[in-house]
């Protein structure tokens, strides 16, 4: 099994990456291959590259920072293009969304991202709480013990 994780932040190794890395580490521990793909650049060639990887993946996790109580504009544009190009390759694959915020807006962000999954008949994988981490820097996210535990729970549930 292989899981493709899309980092919807324009910051390659920021807070969203930190959260996705925790999920990937847990998936790897369960014997599942992972790849974190930098989706913070919605350039069409970048989306095409992700579409090729999605075709080979068995599951998808989409992570985004929270901007104005919503996913980043970059990941929205990226997902709009990806669904147009590769929607057929999304059908029935397990999926999950991850939100990273300094404070608030995470549940609204998760709701927007999960609409892409619902439309493509993707079973949504959850954790023992909302899939979110809190912090303004990767170091702060690394101190969010509850958030990181949620990421590990998500990884274990995706592996199941």
What are the residue ranges of the model-derived segments?
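N-terminal beta1-alpha1-beta2 submodule of the flavodoxin-like/Rossmannoid cofactor-binding fold
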Residues: 1-87, 138-160
């Amino acid at each position: 099994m292989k899981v493709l994780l899309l980092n919807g932040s324009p910051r390659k190794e920021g807070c969203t990456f930190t959260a996705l890395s925790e999920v990937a580490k847990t998936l790897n521990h369960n014997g599942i291959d992972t790849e974190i793909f930098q989706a913070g650049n919605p350039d069409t060639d970048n989306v095409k590259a992700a579409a090729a990887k999605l075709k080979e993946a068995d599951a998808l996790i989409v992570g985004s920072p929270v901007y104005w109580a919503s996913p980043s504009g970059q990941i929205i544009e990226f997902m709009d293009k990806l669904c147009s190009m590769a929607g057929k390759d999304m059908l029935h694959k397990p999926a999950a969304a991850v939100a990273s915020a300094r404070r608030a807006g995470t549940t609204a962000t998760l709701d927007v991202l999960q609409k892409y999954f619902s439309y493509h008949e993707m079973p949504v994988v959850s954790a023992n709480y909302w899939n979110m981490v809190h912090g303004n820097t990767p170091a702060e996210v690394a101190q969010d013990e509850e958030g990181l535990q949620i990421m590990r729970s998500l990884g274990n549930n995706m592996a199941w």
